[in-house]
Amino acid sequence: EVVDLGWNVGPGLMAGEVDAIIGVYWTYESIVMGREGFETNVIYPHDWNVPSYYELVLVTSEDNVENNPDLVERFVSAFNKGYEQAASDPQGSVDTMLALNPDAEIDEVTDREGVELLAPLWKSGSAEVGSLDGSRWDSLVEWMKTQDLVGDSLVAADAYDSSFSK
């Protein structure tokens, strides 16, 4: 049975409303739940024969790309610069987030722990920030077709545009 917990996934799991959760940020919820004495076991989909996939991607409409290419290009460029800076100074990225969001409710301790879990992933691999591997998308789409998650007509290359990343 699938249960929609909304954004209340950690408390829902800890209260026994569900046996497992998916689609959470393992670098956040697992830390918060651990701090509350709840033991977690992070399951990585690729360990269960799900092809590797891109998790955090920038999304815009085809209309925006067509009508505002300069805006999209500048946004992607700024995003990539921020990502590269965060990868080179993870704790500094948390400092920047806190400085730019003084009124936000930010769990600084959790974010500092979480960024240390992410940092090795940011620096792994030889691909440049913002690059996409078409074969990775192809593998995921083909797997999704075998699981009846998408229709047979879906073409992976139609779902992304990496022309704004340099």
State what each model feature region is.
Residues 28, 60, 124-127, 145, ...:
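Residue-level signal for pocket-adjacent positions within structured domains
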Residues 16-18, 127-128:
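Short, contiguous strand/loop micro-motifs
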Residues 137-166:
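Conserved C-terminal helix/tail region of periplasmic/extracytoplasmic solute-binding proteins
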Residues 8-11, 17-103:
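Pocket-lining segment of extracytoplasmic ligand-binding domains
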Residues 67-147:
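Secondary-structure end/capping motifs
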Residues 2-5:
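Short acidic-hydrophobic, aromatic-tinged amphipathic segments that line or gate anion-handling sites
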Residues 61, 133, 161-162:
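Residue-level signal for threonine
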